[in-house]
C-alpha cells in the first residue's frame, strides 16, 4: 500500500462546539494529508448513537451501522478524547461499543487525549486497553495535550513542540497504516499450567 492509498479517519469523542480535541484532531489529519493520505473527521455530534444496548441490533441503533462502516473503511483510525474523571469520554466509548472486531481487529490505531489539567495518562491507558481487547495495533507514538485552555490561541498551537507531537501522530498514522500485526497469541497446550496440571 502506498501512502496515497491510505485513508485515515479520526473519531472525535468530544461533543463541545469549541472542542480542543476536535481542533487537535484536525491538525493531526492535516499532517496525515500532507503525508499523502486521504482523511476524514468522524464528528460524533453528527451521529445519532443511543447508549449501547447489547440486546439491540446495530441496524436498529440510529446511525451506529453508518459509523461502523466509516470506521471499517479506514486504514488507520485515530481516537481522540477529552479526559473526563480520569478516563476518556462516554460518546467515544459508545461509538467504540457499536463497533467491534470487524472494525478494529488488525487495524492501526492512533491515540490522542486532551485534558484541562494534568497530563491525560489514564485516558490514553484506557483507550489503549480497549484497543488491545479488540486486537487493534496501537501506534507507539501517542499524543496528549495537558492544560488545553492554555495550549491554543485562536485555534492554533501556542507551543511548537506540542504541535510537533500532534503532527507526528498524523504522519505515523500514514507510516504505520499497512503494518502487519503479529498473529494472535494463544496458549500452548504444552503449557502445563494452562491445563491445570
Label each residue range with its predicted role.
Residues 2-37:
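N-terminal beta1-alpha1 ligand-phosphate binding loop
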Residues 21, 25, 64, 89-92, ...:
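A general structural signal for well-ordered alpha-helical segments in protein cores
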Residues 62-134:
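Helix-loop-strand module that forms the ligand-binding subsite of alpha/beta enzymes
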Residues 12, 43, 142-144:
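Residue-level recognition of beta-strand->loop/alpha-helix junctions
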Residues 44-61, 153-155:
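N-terminal beta-loop-helix "entrance" segment that forms/cooperates
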Residues 3, 138-197:
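Glycine-rich phosphate/pyrophosphate-binding loop and the adjoining helix
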Residues 13-15, 44, 113-116:
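Cofactor-binding loop segments of dinucleotide-utilizing enzymes, especially the Rossmann-like FAD-
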Residues 38-40, 137:
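Conserved beta-strand segments of alpha/beta enzyme cores
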